[in-house]
Design a protein with these regions (language model features):
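Peripheral docking tails and interdomain loops at the edges
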Residues: 118, 122-177
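Flexible, glycine/charged-enriched surface loops at secondary-structure junctions
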Residues: 48-59, 92-93, 149-154, 177
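Generic secondary-structure signature for well-ordered alpha-helical cores
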Residues: 36, 43-51, 83, 87-90, ...
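Core nucleotide-handling region used for phosphoryl-transfer chemistry
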Residues: 88-118, 122
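Conformationally flexible catalytic loops at phosphate/diphosphate-handling active centers
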Residues: 1-58
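Redox- and metal-dependent alpha/beta enzyme cores, enriched for Fe-S-associated oxidoreductases
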Residues: 62-90, 103-110
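Short glycine/threonine-rich loop-to-helix capping motif typified by GTGT followed
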Residues: 72, 83, 103-114, 133, ...
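A general structural motif
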Residues: 34-53, 70-78, 98-105
């Protein structure tokens, strides 16, 4: 049960305040490198499976004016509605987030068609007292430094395992118009 060199164990590690800040900041370069590394491996997975994955996958009209940004379980429902609405002649799309943290503004902005005028960001969380939910705030921040200025609204879905149904997605697009 005691410590010995043949069976090393570590528990309850701590860093003293005199170096904690520096060690937390020292990892920034590793986090900054992650989007490119993940994108590279997603490319390898795509070659093996035939399914194309990126940090952000866009589906919909190339000249969409209205898009929904979503991640997680609601993405398939939104994509199904986007396909139906596009078949009816509407110009809509969905941006599916696959790597949320670290948030790559470069990859994010490159994935959104230049024609987009209105964006609904759907989060599957509620942040009481906050200006908005996490994904919504990151999307707003990404456009802040851009010369593009679409209208961006936030919304939420799926709290308490409530299903996101196609009628909900249609209502989001109707609200954007």
């Amino acid at each position: 049960r005691g410590l010995n060199p043949d069976n090393p164990v570590i528990r309850g590690t701590a860093q003293n305040p005199d170096i904690y800040f520096q060690t937390r900041e020292a990892v920034n370069n590793y986090y900054d490198a992650l989007p490119e590394i993940v994108e590279e491996y997603m490319g390898k997975i795509s070659k093996m499976t035939g399914r194309e994955y990126h940090l952000f996958n866009y589906y919909g009209a190339e000249d969409a004016e209205d898009i929904i940004i979503v991640m997680g379980s609601g993405a398939d429902t939104v994509r199904t509605v986007v396909e139906k609405l596009n078949a009816e002649g509407k110009k809509v799309g969905v941006l599916v987030v696959h790597l949320y943290r670290p948030f790559s503004i470069k990859h994010f902005m490159n994935a959104i068609p230049a024609s987009v005028k209105r964006i609904a960001v759907l989060d599957r969380t509620k942040e009481p007292g906050a200006f908005g939910e996490p994904l919504y705030l990151d999307v707003r921040a990404a456009f802040y430094a851009s010369d593009r200025n679409p209208m961006i609204i936030g919304g939420r879905y799926g709290l308490g395992s409530k299903d996101l149904v196609p009628a909900d997605v249609v209502a989001v697009f109707d609200n954007l118009a």
